[in-house]
């Protein structure tokens, strides 16, 4: 009796493609590990019949056992015939033989199936999927398979024999691949066991498995072949790159023809879609046309594949019947429109997938950081932040994350994927039809516009370059210039944020802006681990670690990290202050400074505490307030300036001006010997020498007291100041441009002059919201508000005493050092603070005023005594009558 044989079919779940060898993997982790090492260590299973003496798991139905032999890591197995090879190069050459034999050959009548020798129960036998004949060796099996291929060169691949109904799942994007050939066990009945022929084999239930491995990201259609997938993708892009030949095979394999293949070599089978893509352009065209013909009509000849597919309703041309069916369904059922964004989709499945994006459902999880994304495309774009190199690299130097764009780009190269010597593709040339990636997408910071000098802006553009007429930037291609003028100088903002309604010029800017609403910060700093929402902000932040300031002012030498900050700084040199406060008239050269200034007039600050009615100008002050007052914890303070921060990370980011002032001054002026703390200040100081002239010398400013504070003391008379009131004739004052009309004092900026004028006008535009006391400057109000909050951020490092104002700490330090820098010019007595000197100077003023009053009184008494002595003398009657009115007018009493 012939025992019913078992069929074992191996299913492999594939979802991801390796960009180097086109190997398919079932998970993203596997393809990433494979691409890092690119050592094709693949494990497949061979199913055979166990020896009688081997203990194996028995099948309850047949009682026979199956064993599984794993392929060693140093061996490579062909997925077509199961042959084991020792190196990747041998595997490639072996698979090339399969591909070369796929070409249609002359029709040869099918040879009768040779009678196989008696089968042994301890060996693996190979079954023909067409006639069910069994063979003991691969050579006999492949030779027999070749007879079927010669007889029907355009016949569709034989369906896979399945013992049970096939259930394809999971759904979209995860196809199951059935290996074409299966291994059957031989009968163990006796010596007379014969091999069943094609006629004697009973008809079994067969199921054809359609392999749909490639999914279009635009319309969600599935395709079986990469070529069909790429042709379909070309319909979505305006200017696809024309097809060219794929990387060719090795020269010795190309030179050989199918007739020259030795008989001992295994004959080819139709290559599975998960094998290496090693076909040349001609073989691809033949195979694609044959497969299309088989899909259209399995009984027609191959010439039917070239029939053009037109829609009868709109006369639109399609590349495949699948696309035509999708299009016809849109005529019957209509299109599917999203109710939220009005986007149109060709199928309900693509609309459902799109609605999942609106519902913020995240099905794709990043294995590195745990972030979830709604689509696989967003996940792959996110993984660029974790991988130093993109997933797909080309020998010409370009890298791609999208597989479709990489395959399109690879077609532009010649044989072997090497750039053509006649028309090399530069690495920076963008592919036509794909937009240039934005800075937030590529991870590279957007290069701010460098300062353009008059010489470069006035000169003509270099040959082969294109210059923008608005900003004088030069580009190597006209397409880059057009894109620059469109996105940089265009005032229209078409892209709107769906949450807050803010408009943007680019979609990438909207995506970066949306992260401010979601709180996502997927780009951490490798130095301090602070996360950012865009690569451009990360690159700008990293300049704080490196200390690099690439944008330098040509007037004063001050350097900046951003070109926008440099442009605003130039307004200071140009004395251009376009932003004026309507309350007090103070002008600013930056709009945000005017905004911060106006908060002091209203008394309402933007950051309000939820637990108390207090409000603050800065978020940092609010966080410190909540930490100290409501949480009862101590903040992190800067040891140099005493500023408080809610976390140690914010303290490390703090750039202390007091520490910079206390740093040793290493830059010395060669003209006057003055030392400054930076090269920019030295350059500005030398520019002041050049403006003063060769014969003039700049006056050296004393370290303390500062000139603005010393001039605030009202002096009764010039004599009280002595020699300190006049300047030395050998040291003329520094030239300054703005003069006060009241006291003739000079200032360098308009803001300083505006603040000084409040002394004469009595204006105090900064009231305290707690007690109502007003101040002339916002810094005075900030120091005053610490008296209400009880905050004392400035602590003495010697005794630990804390102060609310930094000036009080500086005065307190002189107690420990014994320094008394403020001396009275009248008596020579010295004091630690200027306020004590000011109080002492008042006593001298009072003494001086008392002495003046005494001198005036003595003078008046002397005048009255002289009048009285004159009145004692005897006068004639007429003269006496004339004197009386004069005496009464003078207030002198005449006795007698």
From Swiss-Prot:
Asked if Nucleotide-binding is a keyword of the record, the answer is no
Residue ranges of the region described as Disordered: 239-301, 434-460, 687-733
User: Which segments show compositional bias classed as Polar residues?
Assistant: 247-257
**Major subcellular site:** nucleus
Instruction: Please list the residues that carry the modification Phosphoserine.
Output: 113, 164, 298, 717, 728
Similarity field: Belongs to the krueppel C2H2-type zinc-finger protein family.
Q: Where is the composition biased (Basic and acidic residues)?
A: 274-287
| Chain positions found as Asymmetric dimethylarginine | 832
Please state what the protein is called: Zinc finger protein 574
- A single GO molecular function, which one? zinc ion binding
- Which BP terms does GO give this entry? regulation of transcription by RNA polymerase II
PROSITE patterns for this protein: ZINC_FINGER_C2H2_1, ZINC_FINGER_C2H2_2
PANTHER family linked: GASTRULA ZINC FINGER PROTEIN XLCGF49.1-LIKE-RELATED, ZINC FINGER PROTEIN 200
Kindly list the places in or outside the cell where this protein is found, as annotated in its UniProt entry: Nucleus
Modified-residue entries (Phosphothreonine), positions: 724
Record's function text: May be involved in transcriptional regulation.
Q: Which organism is it from?
A: Homo sapiens (Human)
Q: Which UniProt keywords apply?
A: DNA-binding, Metal-binding, Methylation, Nucleus, Phosphoprotein, Repeat, Transcription, Transcription regulation, Zinc, Zinc-finger
- For bias type Low complexity, the affected ranges are 707-732
Tell me which GO cellular component terms the UniProt record holds. Answer: nucleus
ZnF regions (C2H2-type) run across: 16-38, 76-98, 126-148, 214-236, 309-331, 336-358, 364-386, 392-413, 466-489, 495-517, 523-545, 551-573, 579-601, 607-630, 636-659, 667-689, 738-760, 766-788, 794-816, 822-844
């Amino acid at each position: 009796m012939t025992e019913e044989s078992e069929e074992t079919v191996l299913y492999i779940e594939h979802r991801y493609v390796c960009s180097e060898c086109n190997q398919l993997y079932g998970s993203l982790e596997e393809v990433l590990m494979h691409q890092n090492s690119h050592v094709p260590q693949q494990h497949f299973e061979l199913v055979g019949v166990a020896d009688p003496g081997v203990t194996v798991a028995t099948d309850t139905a047949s009682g026979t056992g199956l064993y599984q032999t794993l392929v060693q890591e140093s061996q490579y197995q062909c997925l077509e015939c199961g042959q084991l090879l020792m190196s990747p190069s041998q595997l490639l050459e072996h698979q090339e033989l399969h591909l070369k034999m796929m070409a249609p050959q002359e029709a040869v009548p099918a040879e009768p199936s040779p009678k196989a020798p008696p089968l042994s129960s301890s060996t693996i036998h190979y079954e023909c999927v067409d006639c069910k004949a069994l063979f003991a060796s691969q050579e006999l099996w492949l030779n027999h398979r070749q007879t079927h291929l010669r007889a029907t060169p355009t016949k569709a691949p034989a369906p896979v024999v399945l013992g049970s109904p096939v259930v394809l799942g999971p759904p979209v994007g995860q196809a199951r691949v059935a290996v074409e050939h299966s291994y059957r066990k031989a009968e163990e009945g006796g010596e007379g066991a014969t091999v069943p022929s094609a006629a004697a084999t009973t008809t079994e239930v067969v199921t054809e498995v359609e392999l749909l491995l490639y999914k279009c990201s635009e319309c969600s259609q599935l395709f079986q072949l990469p070529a069909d997938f790429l042709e379909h993708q070309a319909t979505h892009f305006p200017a696809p790159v024309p097809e060219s030949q794929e990387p060719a095979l090795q020269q010795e394999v190309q030179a050989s023809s199918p007739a020259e293949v030795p008989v001992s070599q295994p004959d080819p089978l139709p290559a599975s879609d998960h094998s290496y893509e090693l076909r040349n352009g001609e073989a691809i065209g033949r195979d694609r046309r044959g497969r299309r013909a088989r899909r259209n009509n399995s009984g027609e000849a191959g010439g039917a594949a070239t029939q053009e597919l037109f829609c009868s309703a709109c006369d639109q041309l399609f590349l495949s019947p699948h696309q035509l069916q999708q299009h016809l369904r849109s005529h019957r059922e209509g299109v599917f429109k999203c109710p939220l964004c009005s986007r149109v989709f060709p199928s309900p499945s693509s609309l459902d997938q799109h609605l999942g994006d609106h519902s913020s459902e995240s099905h794709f999880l990043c294995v590195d950081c745990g972030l979830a994304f709604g689509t696989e495309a967003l996940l792959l774009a996110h993984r660029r932040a974790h991988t130093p190199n993109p997933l797909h690299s080309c020998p010409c130097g370009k890298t791609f994350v999208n597989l479709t764009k990489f395959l399109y780009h690879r077609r532009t190269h010649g044989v072997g994927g090497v750039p053509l010597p006649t028309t090399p593709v530069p690495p920076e040339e963008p592919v036509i039809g794909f937009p240039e990636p934005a800075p937030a997408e590529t991870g590279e910071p957007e290069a701010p516009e460098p300062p353009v000098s008059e010489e470069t802006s006035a000169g003509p553009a270099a040959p082969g370059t294109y210059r923008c007429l608005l900003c004088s930037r030069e580009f190597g291609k006209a397409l880059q210039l057009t894109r620059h003028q469109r996105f940089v100088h265009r005032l229209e903002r078409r892209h709107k944020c769906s949450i807050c309604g803010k408009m943007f010029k680019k979609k990438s800017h909207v995506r970066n802006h949306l992260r401010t609403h979601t709180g996502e910060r997927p780009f951490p700093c490798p130095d301090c681990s602070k996360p950012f929402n865009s690569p451009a902000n990360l690159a700008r932040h990293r300049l704080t670690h490196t200390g690099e300031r690439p944008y330098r002012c040509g007037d004063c030498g001050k350097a900046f990290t951003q070109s926008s900050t440099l442009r605003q700084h130039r307004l200071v040199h140009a004395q251009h202050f376009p932003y004026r406060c309507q309350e007090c008239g103070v002008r600013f050269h930056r709009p945000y400074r005017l905004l911060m200034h106006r908060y002091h007039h209203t008394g309402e600050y933007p950051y309000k505490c939820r637990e108390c009615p207090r409000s603050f100008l800065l978020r940092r002050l609010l966080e410190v307030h909540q930490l100290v007052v409501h949480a009862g914890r101590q903040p992190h303070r800067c040891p140099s300036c005493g500023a408080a921060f809610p976390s140690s990370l914010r303290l490390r980011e703090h750039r202390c001006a007091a520490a910079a002032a206390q740093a040793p001054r290493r830059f010395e002026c060669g003209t006057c010997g003055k030392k400054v703390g930076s090269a920019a200040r030295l350059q500005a100081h030398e520019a002041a020498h050049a403006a003063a002239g060769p014969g003039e010398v700049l006056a050296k400013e004393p370290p303390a007291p500062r000139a603005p504070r010393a001039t605030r003391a009202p002096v009764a008379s010039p004599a009280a100041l002595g020699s300190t009131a006049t300047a030395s004739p050998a040291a003329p004052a520094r030239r300054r441009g703005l003069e006060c009309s009241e006291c003739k004092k000079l200032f360098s900026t308009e803001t300083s002059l505006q603040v000084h004028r409040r002394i004469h006008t009595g204006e105090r535009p900064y009231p305290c919201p707690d007690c109502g006391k007003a101040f002339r400057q916002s810094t005075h109000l900030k120091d005053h508000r610490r008296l209400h909050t009880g905050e004392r951020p400035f602590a003495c490092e010697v005794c630990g005493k804390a102060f609310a104002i930094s000036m009080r700490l500086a005065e307190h330090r002189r107690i420990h050092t014994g320094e008394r820098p403020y001396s009275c010019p009248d008596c020579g007595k010295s004091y630690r603070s200027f306020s004590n000197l000011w109080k002492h100077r008042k006593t001298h003023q009072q003494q001086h005023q008392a002495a003046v009053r005494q001198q005036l009184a003595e003078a008046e008494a002397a005048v009255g005594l002289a009048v009285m002595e004159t009145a004692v003398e005897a006068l004639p009657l007429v003269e006496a009558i004339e004197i009386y009115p004069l005496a009464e007018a003078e207030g002198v009493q005449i006795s007698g």
